[in-house]
Amino acid sequence: MVALLIFLGIFTCVETLPLSDSPSSYIPEEVPSSQTADIGLPPPTEFTLPNEDDEILIRKLNIQKTRKEILYGPSLIGKTSFFISGPLGDQISQRDQTLWSRDAAPVVQAVSHDAAAALHDIQIHGGLQNLDDYKILYQGHWSSSVPGGIAKGQFSNFTSDLLFSMERLSTNPYILRRLHPHADELPFAVDSKIVQKLTGSTLPSLHKAGRLFLADHSYQKDYVAQEGRYAAACQALFYLDDRCHQFLPLAIKTNVGSNLTYTPLDEPNDWLLAKVMFNVNDLFHGQMYHLASTHAVAEIVHLAALRTMSSRHPVLALLQRLMYQAYAIRPIGNNILFNPGGLIDQNSVFSNVAVRKFATDFYPTVAGPVRSNYFEANLRSRGLLNATHGPDLPHFPFYEDGARIIKVIRTFIQSFVKSIYKSDKVLAKDWELQAWIAEANGAAEVIDFPPTPLKKRKHLVDILTHMAWLTGVSHHVLNQGEPVTTSGVLPLHPGSLYAPVPGEKGVVDSLLPWLPNEQKSVDQISFLALFNRPQIVENNRTLRYMFNSESLLAGTVRAVAAANERFMEEMGHISQEISNRKFDDDGLSQGMPFIWTGMDPGVIPFYLSV
């Protein structure tokens, strides 16, 4: 409840921020179509390329003015990308913070009400006396803040090894990689008799066959847990079983204290605690990785565009749509999430200091590069897609859903780009677009951006598709409503351990000492529920309506509007399929013992919502 009180207090402060120093500034409450809306001018009614604009001098003067008023400021929350700055940049950020706060207000109120009811019920029950009691915290509660409820199967199957392993291929697919038979060494040893009994094979044989996978959180051993909280720094080995054709866990190594290695053949409580310890590390990774891989990347690419393209440019208009409220998140996060004593310090095993270190360490090489993080390129680089050194994954929910969604996004972007540029030659002559590419590679310091000059329309399609993927899909797989419904559901996914990592096996009679108590549990659920935005379904701000912007469509040719109609129709079909998922005769959905809907286009926002 302390978290909610702090959130409400900061929310009130942000809500009262002025939109501008000038009372006459035109700053719309809805999604801005272009930067003209930000500087007090009505948005253009038609978008044009610079070499087709009859008012080219005015256009150039506006860009010059914008470059003086939108600047690169210091990074926020670790050393990642520059944050928007300057007189106009500050105004844009304040506007976004105000819009964000208005959206947050009903969520905060709903969470506060839901939390009080959940805490009351568990206290009436007599507290958490066993693991099944954690269901009481959820069942019949959180209907206002999390109306879709908890993912089916998360309670009934929380001890399942298949559930644990398949979460690596759905709720957080960004830490897993296949071990290459030659380029990668085995990360740690596992007793050969245990491996044989579990897999029917040997560790070297699995490695050689490309059937061995690693999720490595050993970097977290450098982080200092907060007082009264504890964490391991787990590495987990997974394997493809050629007998049952499933992706399963093999071993978990803690890398702290006695550095124990756990396997599914250990005592049930020992093994379940090992999975909980891994999930503490994984929940921290997912939440902090999303910050560096989506917010920091999308912002800097867009910021470079703001400084180089006219408000009349159709590409900037599209980017503006995608970046709705984008410049609210890092400053608000800096003030209420990652500040000393803030929400992260209250709910996570590690403090805000670790968050900043994570962002600083991961952004330059893992989370920040653009091209190497294109959807399929990223999966191929980790051996999860089209691997040449091992068999295909029998089920890969993240890819299965993501591939369909990104195909629909790409199809719209292709239509959009072709409607603007009739040929590659036309694109090559667009000096504003080329200035954007040069700026991104230069002053903006975007990592691994397509090189200048941009010569092909397909390369622009790649950039814009990736931006839409980051803002409308990738972000929500790790954040938004996903943690409260799946990846942060108790008792399997606590934000911290509350007892030291065991120094030996066979001493865990109950997991309760390591898990959050009643109050801490309600605090965790409340904290994660604050990220959810259920109201976007009613006001058509879901992924399905990503490009359904009146100003964007009115300012472009009819072909773009037609492409948007097809986009909404296709996303509607995907949404219907995902929302209607059920368990098959084996009690599985997409090969998992829980139903995952984290990419439902009819539920997730089209923008960086939190």
Curated annotation (Swiss-Prot):
PROSITE patterns: LIPOXYGENASE_3. InterPro entries: LipOase (IPR000907), LipOase_C (IPR013819), LipOase_C_sf (IPR036226). It comes from the Eukaryota. It catalyses: (9Z,12Z)-octadecadienoate + O2 = (11S)-hydroperoxy-(9Z,12Z)-octadecadienoate; (9Z,12Z)-octadecadienoate + O2 = (11R)-hydroperoxy-(9Z,12Z)-octadecadienoate; (9Z,12Z)-octadecadienoate + O2 = (13S)-hydroperoxy-(9Z,11E)-octadecadienoate; (9Z,12Z,15Z)-octadecatrienoate + O2 = (11S)-hydroperoxy-(9Z,12Z,15Z)-octadecatrienoate. Its EC number is 1.13.11.-, 1.13.11.45. The keyword Lipid metabolism does not apply. Lipoxygenase that metabolizes linoleic and alpha-linolenic acids to 9-, 11- and 13-hydroperoxy fatty acids. Oxidizes linoleic acid to mainly 11R-, 13S- and racemic 9-HPODE, and alpha-linolenic acid to 11-HPOTrE. Residues 47-610 form the Lipoxygenase domain. Three His residues, the carboxyl oxygen of the C-terminal Ile or Val residue, and a fifth residue, usually Asn, ligate the metal, which binds water to form a catalytic base Mn(2+)OH(2) for hydrogen abstraction. One of its GO terms (biological process) is lipid oxidation. It is found in: Secreted. Glycans are attached at residues 157, 259, 386, 540. Residues 1-16 form the signal peptide. The keyword Nuclease does not apply. One of its GO terms (molecular function) is linoleate 13S-lipoxygenase activity. GO terms for cellular component: extracellular region. Belongs to the lipoxygenase family. Manganese lipoxygenase subfamily. Keywords: Dioxygenase, Glycoprotein, Manganese, Metal-binding, Oxidoreductase, Secreted, Signal. Its cofactor is Mn(2+). Mn(2+) binds at residues 290, 295, 475, 479, 610. It is an enzyme of class 1 (oxidoreductase). This is Manganese lipoxygenase. N- and O-glycosylated.
